[in-house]
């Protein structure tokens, strides 16, 4: 049992780290710089630690810039103000993200400038064979080490960690919590759950000062 719980918690925080550090702070906001080799290393590490949840740094970065530009308007890729359920919001998010990541939608230059892009690797990492490979690896870990039947209930969550991380912030941190700053959107600080989110729940602060680390 302990091995599965360690695996689950480690996967949660490692996948979240690469989402917040590489995809969010670096790809979206250029809060710091990387050389081309370091950047490619982070692409690969993101694929390893997000696994079946891999998010394209380009797709994520562009969409997140659009979120800040259009926060809580009809053009926001994900706003609880315009979607009546968390599931509808996340499906809309997935649709927009997929179109950007695959090149089906070409956003304005202001959203794409400087966002890291490695098309060959991204296409591979987002592919179904890649996702199925990681999914099979997770199933194998559970098969070998899940000593209690209830532990298998954790497995579906591991297939969906990245969307779960996004839903916590983009739904709950726009509906619940407190505000330090009056901004032109509904962002809030959702601190009771920030132990799960590595600082991402300071969402109102982030919407006020988006480029700060």
Task: List each model region and its residues.
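Active-site-proximal inter-transmembrane loops
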Residues: 54, 112-119, 176-209
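A cytosolic-side transmembrane-helix exit/cap motif
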Residues: 26-27, 171-179
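Non-catalytic, topology-defining segments of multipass membrane proteins
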Residues: 1-168, 211-213
